[in-house]
Swiss-Prot record:
Keyword Magnesium: yes
Swiss-Prot/TrEMBL catalytic activity: (R)-4'-phosphopantetheine + ATP + H(+) = 3'-dephospho-CoA + diphosphate
Positions annotated to bind substrate: T11, K43, T79, R93
Pathway terms, separated by semicolons: Cofactor biosynthesis; coenzyme A biosynthesis; CoA from (R)-pantothenate: step 4/5
Entry protein name: Phosphopantetheine adenylyltransferase
Underlying gene: coaD
Subunit structure: Homohexamer.
This protein's GO CC annotations: cytoplasm
GO molecular function, one term: ATP binding
Originating species: Lactococcus lactis subsp. cremoris (strain SK11)
UniProt xrefs under InterPro entries: Cyt_trans-like, PPAT, Rossmann-like_a/b/a_fold
Site-annotated residues for Transition state stabilizer: H19
Alphabetical UniProt keywords: ATP-binding, Coenzyme A biosynthesis, Cytoplasm, Magnesium, Nucleotide-binding, Nucleotidyltransferase, Transferase
Amino acid sequence: MTEKIGLFTGTFDPLTNGHLDIIKRASQHFDQLYVGIFKNDQKNPLFPTDKRVEMLEEALTNLSVTHKVKVIKHERDLTVNIAKKLDVTALVRSLRNSQDLEYEKNMFYFNLEMTGIETLFFLAKPELEPLNSTRMRELHAFGQDVSAWVPENVSRELRKLDEEKK
């Protein structure tokens, strides 16, 4: 039987409780789930890639999936190219709303055409739908406490950023 290998990618800047929920739920469907932290040249990150990897790995220790989940980073490549190198059997994407669906439908088409790799979509739980990294960065930039929506270790790192600015 072929091993089921998934790949869930993002910038995770910062990591949210919504991301963790998708990772936990998706890991139940794979023998191995890679979580790829990728650099996005169109975004100005709060945290460098290595720090985001460190924060995700720490947050995962609180979930019971660390034996199945491996965090990887990549500075510059298409998700589908990484997926081919890792023998991924399915890409993992999350959908919070209709805007996500429209964007992901387009990506689904090209990913499937270029690699033949299917994409599995996980709907965000209703209470996690509003969460996204952009909103967390915006709220944090205006001095708002986002600790209810991000893992504790991420909240701690955001507070450190604030201290460094003083």
